[in-house]
Amino acid sequence: MLPTRMLADPPLSLYVHLPWCVHKCPYCDFNSHAIKGGLPEAEYAAALLRDLQQDLPRVRGRHLQSVFLGGGTPSLFRPETIALILDEARQCLPLIDGAEITLEANPGTIERGRFAEYRAAGVTRLSIGVQSFNTLHLQILGRIHSAQEAINAAEEAHAAGLDNFNLDLMYGLPQQTLEQALMDIRSAIALAPAHLSHYQLTLEPNTLFHAHPPALPDDEVTWQMQLACQAVLCKQGFNQYEISAYARNGRQCGHNLNYWRYGDYLGIGAGAHSKLSDLQQGRILRLWKVKQPSAYLRTAGTAQGIGAITDVAEADRIFEFMLNRLRLYEGFSPADFELATCLPYARIHTALEQAQALNLVQKTRGRWQPTPTGYAYLNDLQARFLPEVSTPATPRLRPTVRA
């Protein structure tokens, strides 16, 4: 463990989970629940505020650099409720100047003028879940919106003065061709987003797609989709700063950057996770709230509302740091590792040199980052830092699944 005098609190973000959606998509493994009978909006907002008050002693005196309202479908909540949540957060935890406040939105839930109302409530950034502009693929993915509604949502964001918005897109979809994947990218670029997230569809456990797998494009086709879309985005002025994230004009997602840099985050809401550093003790804590919304509504703000609290073991800190930081194109320095993990750089130096000998990582101006080969086999590179796992002599020839 490093001396505490050498350490400073990592940046802190707030995640607010709003778990309800109109319809559970067959690929979604998030803690989301289709609305049955009505949205308990006021009751849930009150539970969130109790939850936040309970967690304050863990982060008192710190400032928030970002807030992210995720789900579920946060755009189901009225702007007045979003304003209430954000106002309470500001009173409890000061926000830094220019703090990023993101709200996730489903194009199928947006009425005219709604984004302007969210902006008035304090939202500074939107993340719009488009996934595809192809009618067949939207149906296969179980999305409730049409391609035109996705276009309308982006235009509404511009009209509201929320030009800093992200579009989520997926590729490697059932029955998708390379040209269709490129059409999705071109359609997204035409809407002038500041940010674009481009994820490969994966079949996650506890989803309908996992139980009844659809036929997906083969690995070679999916790889070509990724490379071709990547080339189009870069040509159009999008800078790839993370495996699946692209930004124009420096408008990276500050909230996700804090995750990927192994910063701290406080999570409130059903199933929300937190990662918090206790530098005086040289500890990193993880805690999460009960998952079921009905149980959360009953127990938020009490000891019963916390599902578990655990200490992150030193070996797990190493893996978690590398799992996240290796996704970023900015690389990391030895000091970045020490400040984020409270551990000496010597704990990873040998493993990095071994990976360097295999052309998986490189060191440039004092910063480590994957090589092109390392990014292509990122899962294998990350696995070299798993606790108590003997590392393979050479990488396995399997492209990384980008998600």
Label the model's feature ranges.
Residues L14-L18:
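Short active-site neighborhood of thiol/selenol oxidoreductases, capturing the structured segment around
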Residues P19-S32:
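Local cysteine-cluster metal-coordination motifs and their immediate loop/turn environment
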Residues D168, D316-L323, H349, P372-Y375, ...:
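Non-catalytic, well-ordered alpha-helical scaffold segments
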Residues C342-Q354:
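Short amphipathic alpha-helical interaction segments
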Residues Q356-G366:
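A short, conserved structural fragment
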Residues R367-T371:
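Minor-groove-contacting beta-hairpin "wing" of winged helix-turn-helix DNA-binding domains
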